[in-house]
Curated annotation (Swiss-Prot):
It comes from Deinococcus deserti (strain DSM 17065 / CIP 109153 / LMG 22923 / VCD115). This is GTPase Der. GO terms for biological process: ribosome biogenesis. Associates with the 50S ribosomal subunit. Belongs to the TRAFAC class TrmE-Era-EngA-EngB-Septin-like GTPase superfamily. EngA (Der) GTPase family. Disulfide bonds: none annotated. Pfam families: KH_dom-like, MMR_HSR1. GTPase that plays an essential role in the late steps of ribosome biogenesis. Residues 2-164, 173-343 form the EngA-type G domain. GTP 2 binds at residues 179-186, 226-230, 288-291.
Length: 441
């Protein structure tokens, strides 16, 4: 696997660049120097190449940690094929910058000079001084605004050796964000990707079409689909079209984020919950604007959520604030976990051991003295996990009992949080004759 080290003096934006490239907030970012002291590693994917990035502490900081930080940076250099040397040219080259440059010449690794905090083309006048370092043409970027990153990564790739073998492409997880207008879907998308790809405004219905955004998190590719807000009754032909686009996006997705406004929930949420449930896709309920709920209202808000979303009570919840970036990491981590469960397959032998124990311990439906008997169970599909159960009388299975059984399957068979489907079958070698049934009751 390729390895690239990010170095520079304190407070030039190394950690901001690291976080931007790996797609999550792993390193602590602040406006004062010396925040990062340890070397942090993160995995990113670029054009199907896996690259380990190492974020090092600020070199030549002049504080008590300087020797330890330099030692860790030297360790990071050992396996690196290239070095990204980050500077803030707006402040001019400092003595520490020249010290780092001299050290890099002794190390002897390929160096890409990065001029960070170049937020607009007019700031590129600051780049002239960097030529004097002797590392070639600097790359102008803004880690905060994601400017110039493709050019930087293309430059990095020129210094990395060719892969010995092709890395199998990681299939992306497609996630749709659904919710009624103005619950913060676009703000969440922008917070996740650290971009302004989606238009955000206070007026409901800003997003009229589905918007696909590709992103990487911990080596996993995602395609995030920000759908138009779904109203209970479309006001216009455009709204009607938006609903169709949203429903189509759900069908193309592997997973759904159902975004609700913690401070303003209505009957719309029940409709959306049903829409999500019927799709058979895993659903994560994203309770946005949670920071705006007063402490004394937390229990009541939870009660409202339970009532309006009872149809998908099994779905996990993540409490977020798009404005404060609260809960953003959990949204992606939970999505990866649910996606794995959604595609999982359980051995038939394990299913039938569970079924046997279940019937011994739990009461089953009983009609006029005759009991439901379940003889055999097997998984017939994944995504969602679907199980066929052979029984004596499928008509004995009530909706309430099936829901209860689905919940137990989720809890007992490590499928918590994902939809489960059951197919009842009276045919096959496990079907008993009427005479046999009567004799066993």
């Amino acid at each position: 696997m390729h390895k690239v080290a990010i170095v520079g003096r304190p407070n030039v934006g190394k950690s901001s660049l690291f976080n931007r490239l790996i797609g999550r907030r792993e390193a602590v970012v602040a406006d004062f120097p010396g925040v990062t002291r340890d070397a942090k590693e993160g995995l990113m994917l670029y054009h199907n190449h896996r690259i380990t990035l190492v974020d090092t502490g600020g070199l030549w900081s002049g504080d008590e940690w300087e020797a330890a930080i330099r030692e860790k940076a030297e360790w990071a250099m050992e396996g690196a094929q290239a070095v990204v040397f980050v500077l803030d040219p707006r402040e001019g080259l400092s003595a520490a910058d020249y010290e780092v440059a001299d050290w890099l010449r002794r190390v002897g690794k390929p160096v890409i000079v990065v001029a960070n905090k170049i937020d607009s083309p007019k700031h590129e006048v600051y780049l002239a001084e960097l030529w004097g370092l002797g590392f070639g043409d600097p790359v102008a970027i803004s880690a905060e605004h994601a400017r110039g990153l493709d050019e930087l990564l293309d430059r990095v790739m020129t210094h990395l050796p060719a892969d010995d073998e092709d890395v199998p492409e990681v299939a992306p997880i497609r996630i749709s964000l659904i919710g009624r207008p103005n619950v913060g879907k676009s703000s969440l998308l922008n917070a996740i990707t650290n971009t302004d790809r989606a238009i955000v405004a206070d007026q409901p219905g800003t997003t009229r079409d589905s918007l696909d955004v590709e992103w990487d998190f911990g080596g996993q590719r995602f395609v995030l689909v920000d759908t138009a807000g779904i109203r209970k009754k479309p006001d216009t032909a455009i709204e009607d079209y938006a609903i169709q686009r949203s429903q189509a996006a759900i069908q193309r997705s592997d997973l759904i984020w159902l975004v609700v406004n913690a401070t303003d929930m209505g009957d719309h949420e029940l409709k959306l919950a049903n829409l999500a449930y019927e799709s058979g896709k895993p659903v994560i309920v994203v309770v946005n604007k949670w920071d705006l709920v007063p402490d004394e209202e937390l229990k009541r808000t939870e009660k409202d959520l339970n009532q309006k979303l009872h149809h998908i009570s099994f779905a996990p919840r993540v409490y977020t604030s798009a404005i404060n970036d609260y809960g953003i990491h959990e949204m992606l981590a939970e999505a990866m976990k649910l996606h794995d469960k959604w595609q999982s397959r359980i051995p038939t032998s394990e299913l039938n051991r569970w079924l046997e124990v279940w019937q011994m311990r739990q009461a089953v439906p009983n009609f006029h003295g005759k009991k439901l008997k379940m003889y055999f169970m097997t998984q017939v599909e994944t995504a969602p996990p679907t199980f066929a159960i052979f029984c004596n009388r499928a008509d004995f299975v009530t909706r309430a009992y099936e829901g209860y059984l689905q919940n137990r399957i989720r809890e007992d068979l490590q499928l918590a949080g994902v939809p489960v489907r059951l197919k009842w079958n009276e045919k096959g070698p496990y079907k008993r004759g009427k005479k046999d049934e009567d004799s066993e009751d």
